Amino acid sequence: MYLTKEQIDSTAHLTSRQAARKLNVGKTSINKYRRHYAQYGDLKLPENARVLIIDIESKPLTGYFWGLWKQNIGTSQIIDSGGMMCFAAKWLGSDEIIFSSEFSDGHRDMVYKVWGLLDEADMVVTYNGDRYDIKRINNEFLKEGFTPPSPFKSIDLYKTNKVRFDLPSKKLDYIAELTGSGNKLKHQGFDLWVGCMEGDPEAWQTMQEYNEQDVLLTERVYIKLLPWLTNIPHMGMFSGNGTACPYCGVDSLVDDGRTTKTHVQEYTLYQCTNCDGWSRGNKPIGEKLESRTVR
């Protein structure tokens, strides 16, 4: 259930439990929206698009090798080719985080669950997912004999980070902390993966918390980067609203009299009061400049 800023503000004097009873929602929802409005203000999220945030964790390959330096390992030396061991996902703006692993569900059921989510999604948001997560997930579909899910638009925030900024680090943890979105969960390092591969329940609990935190960070960074995105579809098409903001899909564009110019034409410039994204009209102002010169 979506809660407006006015609803949350009306319960500011109440505890989370009391506010949950008043608004007939779970306490988790109250806490989530209080954090959301404290951080983002009255930012509205697209309601008609199915936007999936996802992150996977993989186990390493195991095999026979003769040393630690400059080894060429053939396919005949591979014992186990590794692959996806778990994933965490959530729908943008939802309270629920979906987690599945080999340990809790078995490999095939885990793969089936992630296939169903991707098949339902209009957009899939990842951090470095075009190079890693999506391809690794496709590996599992191929191994299990699944056909591809229905097409979706991939939004890789790593690419936005790389194209738009020149930060000292391209890691999710860095841009998440920089934007006030939080930090990755600290853990014991590679020993965590070893514990999971050995079936240690405590290791799997930590892995789940780590995986779920990455999904939350990815969602928060997505919201922070909304006005910077260059590879996002026009969000207005999901609601059928041609005047909606292309970035967030909310009908909140403002024309303050400014224009933007291409090489030979001029267009009205708009800014969204919800996400602050800039866009331009699709109808030129005045006549196209007829020039006898080129460059």
Regions found by a protein language model. Give the residues of each.
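Short, amphipathic alpha-helical "recognition" segments used to contact nucleic acids or chromatin
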Residues: 1-15
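Short alpha-helical "recognition helix" segments of helix-turn-helix
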Residues: 18-23
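Short, solvent-exposed alpha-helical "recognition" segments
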Residues: 30-46
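Conserved RNase H-like, two-metal-ion catalytic cores of nucleic-acid enzymes
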Residues: 44-118
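Conserved DEDDh/DEDDy metal-dependent 3′-5′ exonuclease domain
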Residues: 93-178
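Acidic, Mg2+-coordinating catalytic module of metal-dependent nucleases/exonucleases
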Residues: 125, 174-239
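Short, cysteine/histidine-rich loop/knuckle motifs that typically chelate Zn2+
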Residues: 246-250, 274
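Short metal-binding segments enriched for Cys and/or His
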Residues: 269-295
